Amino acid sequence: MAPNIRKSHPLLKMMNNSLIDLPTPSNISDWWNFGSLLGICLATQILTGLLLAAHYTADTTLAFSSVAHTCRNVQHGWLIRNLHANGASFFFICIYLHIGRGLYYGSYLYKETWNTGVILLLTLMATAFVGYVLPWGQMSFWGATVITNLFSAVPYIGQTLVEWAWGGFSVDNPTLTRFFTLHFLLPFMIMGLTLIHLTFLHESGSNNPLGIVSNCDKIPFHPYFSLKDILGFMLMLFPLMTLALFSPNLLGDPENFTPANPLVTPPHIKPEWYLLFAYAIRRSIPNKLGGVLALAASVLILFLAPLLHKSKQRTMTFRPFSQLLFWTLAANLLILTWVGSQPVEHPFIIIGQLASLTYFTILLILFPIIGALENKMLNY
């Protein structure tokens, strides 16, 4: 019999083992679709980003008008920009659901895969932040000023660090230039990290909703899950196109239609919606250094997930108390997101502080306690 090139060719063999003949647990649900959706998001963002970069000018005097020019005069430039801006929102929706799936089904016990995933999240957040600065509108400028200023909370070297990041004594042309450089570079770094993430995943194989070893019942990825993934792509691309075509500015800030002006501060400086939960946590501590540490902890806490797992069962499928806690955490994150978009005044301050306290309490204290309690309940 002639050798199958798919299985013998050095490059095709790798593709085959990752996407075609990959042994996959037969019972994984739609929650396992988000990994491939993230891949599609990344590809879409890189493609639209490259097309936008071809027409963008990283200069404070020209950045705003170059973006306007792209939307007005470039063939389908408006669509490319709208897809890129709203694609970022979908990227974050997918990654948050992907992380939620990982927490619910105990996927974090694959430590290497989980840790590279958290690094991917941090890189994505950095990419989105520097990208938001590029149109050089009011919120771009003041967002860059406020967030980079947080580095000044670092003891002793803080101020030097901030001025080094700015390339001067305030956010100006050098800042915009380096932010464009970073925004161009980081997605390729994300691609590399994604390959590492997948390499670690394919070492152990996928987890499944029951959290049990599935070696006895695996099926090839293609055609079973490749077909399921295509359905996922359609279900994601449809709302993305709808948003980009009918309501492209729904998730943006109206303030960003005004060119950056260092002499006028917007009444309420806030990041894009997908970073608001961390912003709300940062804001709920009335001390600069404390706020910065809480901001960092809000994401870095994910690294602790494998250490805080105390249950004898891997997933939450058969753990009703942990499920209740998990959905409380999800609701709490929505509250934090909402509070982050509100002005710093009563009652939003106290709501934000309570929600921040709840966030850390659930993850650090209640999850391990409930896990141990459910172990005890197994004996009765």
UniProtKB/Swiss-Prot annotation:
Matching InterPro entries: Cyt_b/b6_C, Cyt_b/b6_C_sf, Cyt_b/b6_N, Cytb/b6-like_sf, Cytochrome_b, Cytochrome_b_C_euk/bac, Cytochrome_b_N_euk/bac, Di-haem_cyt_TM
Which cellular compartments is it found in? Answer: Mitochondrion inner membrane
GO BP term, example: mitochondrial electron transport, ubiquinol to cytochrome c
The record's section on PROSITE patterns has: CYTB_CTER, CYTB_NTER
Q: Which cofactor does it need?
A: heme b
Mind listing the UniProt keywords for this protein, alphabetically? Electron transport, Heme, Iron, Membrane, Metal-binding, Mitochondrion, Mitochondrion inner membrane, Respiratory chain, Transmembrane, Transmembrane helix, Transport, Ubiquinone
GO molecular function term, any single one: ubiquinol-cytochrome-c reductase activity
What binding details are noted for the cofactor? Binds 2 heme b groups non-covalently.
Sequence positions that bind heme b b566: H98, H197
- What sections of the protein cross the membrane? 34-54, 78-99, 114-134, 179-199, 227-247, 289-309, 321-341, 348-368
Q: Please, what other remarks does the record include? A: Heme 1 (or BL or b562) is low-potential and absorbs at about 562 nm, and heme 2 (or BH or b566) is high-potential and absorbs at about 566 nm.
Function comment? Component of the ubiquinol-cytochrome c reductase complex (complex III or cytochrome b-c1 complex) that is part of the mitochondrial respiratory chain. The b-c1 complex mediates electron transfer from ubiquinol to cytochrome c. Contributes to the generation of a proton gradient across the mitochondrial membrane that is then used for ATP synthesis.
Assembly, in brief, is: The cytochrome bc1 complex contains 11 subunits: 3 respiratory subunits (MT-CYB, CYC1 and UQCRFS1), 2 core proteins (UQCRC1 and UQCRC2) and 6 low-molecular weight proteins (UQCRH/QCR6, UQCRB/QCR7, UQCRQ/QCR8, UQCR10/QCR9, UQCR11/QCR10 and a cleavage product of UQCRFS1). This cytochrome bc1 complex then forms a dimer.
Q: What is this protein called?
A: Cytochrome b
User: What organism is this sequence from?
Assistant: Antigone vipio (White-naped crane)
